[in-house]
């Protein structure tokens, strides 16, 4: 049988020279490297070009924003450095201090976002201070001074009560001798431990003088009394602002420091923090100040409370 006839029909064209591939299409052999005789044709894609251009545009915008932010930071640093190197001084040569200092902030350039948010200044309650030009012109008067002293020895209270003038002793009611003198007009509480409390003086000098007189009386009765550790424990002052006061409005506004129970006590109790003074304020305008250790604390407390009372003046 013929060789061509033994091949299947679909393979006869490949074996015969007439059925060979047309010229122009290369036939690959096992020894021919892949891609030989093929002309590469570039593939152009418009989508890939547009993506590259968009990425380049975004990179340029980011670089511009970074340059603007660096310029803002540099300007802020230069301003802070100049202000720290040249502090302002007052007439006394000292740098003035503000009560509420504000942090320096720089406004961002148009089209950019700020580097740091502006800080919020916290609200803190402060005690209103009276300017020197608005002084009240009222000086509280001292009404009572309480002082203590140590006589430095044990005392027989029954002997003192029997032998001293103007002295009374009732141990069932109070475990101390109550003694009084006329000049200065004061009262003393004398305890068996040797401690003594003197009340009723109108000034610091009167309180010390009265305490020395009581100690001299105890010495004359045969006790080795001394005069040790004299100290003023409390001072009480009072004054009148000459106008009625709305206590209801005052207690609502300053409820953190004050209490007002007209059914229990007719006055408003105001507890000042600095100086540590307790004030009794009455609707008539009378003010009582207590709890001071020195006279200056009473004057300072009244100058602090006067502008507050002026703001709650009754208008009739």
Swiss-Prot record:
- Residues in sequence repeats: 142-218, 232-309
Biological process, per Gene Ontology: mRNA transcription by RNA polymerase II; positive regulation of transcription initiation by RNA polymerase II; RNA polymerase II preinitiation complex assembly; transcription by RNA polymerase II; transcription by RNA polymerase III
UniProt region (Disordered), positions on chain = 1-21, 104-135
Chain residues that bind DNA: 144, 180, 195, 234, 271
Supply the Gene3D superfamilies for this chain.
TATA-Binding Protein (3.30.310.10)
| Pfam (any one) | TBP
Output the Gene Ontology terms for molecular function: aryl hydrocarbon receptor binding; DNA binding; enzyme binding; RNA polymerase I core promoter sequence-specific DNA binding; RNA polymerase II cis-regulatory region sequence-specific DNA binding; RNA polymerase II core promoter sequence-specific DNA binding; RNA polymerase II general transcription initiation factor activity; RNA polymerase II-specific DNA-binding transcription factor binding
Q: In which tissues is it expressed?
A: Ubiquitously expressed.
Q: Where is the composition biased (Low complexity)?
A: 104-115, 123-133
- Tell me where it mainly resides: nucleus
- InterPro entries, alphabetized: TBP, TBP_CS, TBP_dom_sf, TBP_eukaryotic
Q: Name one GO cellular component term.
A: transcription factor TFIID complex
Q: Does the keyword DNA-binding apply?
A: yes
Q: Which UniProt keywords apply?
A: DNA-binding, Nucleus, Repeat, Transcription, Transcription regulation
Family to which the UniProt record says this protein belongs: Belongs to the TBP family.
**Its quaternary structure?**
Binds DNA as monomer. Belongs to the TFIID complex together with the TBP-associated factors (TAFs). Part of a TFIID-containing RNA polymerase II pre-initiation complex that is composed of TBP and at least GTF2A1, GTF2A2, GTF2E1, GTF2E2, GTF2F1, GTF2H2, GTF2H3, GTF2H4, GTF2H5, GTF2B, TCEA1, ERCC2, ERCC3, TAF1, TAF2, TAF3, TAF4, TAF5, TAF6, TAF7, TAF8, TAF9, TAF10, TAF11, TAF12 and TAF13. Component of the transcription factor SL1/TIF-IB complex, composed of TBP and at least TAF1A, TAF1B, TAF1C and TAF1D. Association of TBP to form either TFIID or SL1/TIF-IB appears to be mutually exclusive.
User: What does the UniProt function comment say about this protein?
Assistant: General transcription factor that functions at the core of the DNA-binding multiprotein factor TFIID. Binding of TFIID to the TATA box is the initial transcriptional step of the pre-initiation complex (PIC), playing a role in the activation of eukaryotic genes transcribed by RNA polymerase II. Component of a BRF2-containing transcription factor complex that regulates transcription mediated by RNA polymerase III. Component of the transcription factor SL1/TIF-IB complex, which is involved in the assembly of the PIC (pre-initiation complex) during RNA polymerase I-dependent transcription.
According to UniProt, the name of this protein is TATA-box-binding protein
Protein encoded by which gene: Tbp
């Amino acid at each position: 049988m013929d060789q061509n006839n033994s091949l299947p029909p679909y393979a006869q064209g490949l074996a015969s020279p007439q059925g060979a591939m047309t010229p122009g299409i290369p036939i690959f052999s096992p020894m021919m490297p892949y891609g030989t005789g093929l002309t590469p044709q570039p593939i152009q894609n418009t989508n890939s070009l547009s993506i590259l251009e968009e990425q380049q545009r975004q990179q340029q915008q980011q670089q511009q924003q970074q340059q603007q932010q660096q310029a803002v930071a540099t300007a802020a640093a230069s301003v802070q450095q100049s202000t720290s190197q040249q502090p302002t001084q007052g007439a006394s040569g000292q740098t003035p201090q503000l009560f509420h200092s504000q942090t320096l902030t720089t406004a961002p350039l148009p089209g950019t976002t700020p580097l740091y948010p502006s800080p919020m200044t916290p609200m803190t309650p402060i005690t209103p201070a009276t300017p020197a030009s608005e002084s009240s012109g009222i000086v509280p008067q001292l009404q009572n001074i309480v002082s203590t002293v140590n006589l430095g020895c044990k005392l027989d209270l029954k002997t003192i009560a029997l032998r001293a003038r103007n002295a009374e002793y009732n141990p069932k009611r109070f475990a101390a001798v109550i003694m009084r003198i006329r000049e200065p007009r004061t009262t003393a509480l004398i305890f068996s431990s040797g401690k003594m409390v003197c009340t009723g003086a109108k000034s610091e000098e009167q309180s010390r003088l009265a305490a020395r007189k009581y100690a001299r009386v105890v010495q004359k009765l045969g006790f080795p009394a001394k005069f040790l550790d004299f100290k003023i424990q409390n001072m009480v002052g009072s004054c009148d602002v000459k106008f009625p006061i709305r206590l209801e409005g005052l207690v609502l506004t300053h409820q953190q420091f004050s209490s007002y129970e007209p059914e229990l006590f007719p006055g408003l109790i105001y507890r000042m923090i600095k100086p540590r003074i307790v004030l009794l304020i009455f609707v008539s305008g009378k003010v009582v100040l207590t709890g001071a250790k020195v006279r200056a604390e009473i004057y300072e407390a009244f100058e602090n409370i006067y502008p507050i009372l002026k703001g709650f003046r009754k208008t009739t």
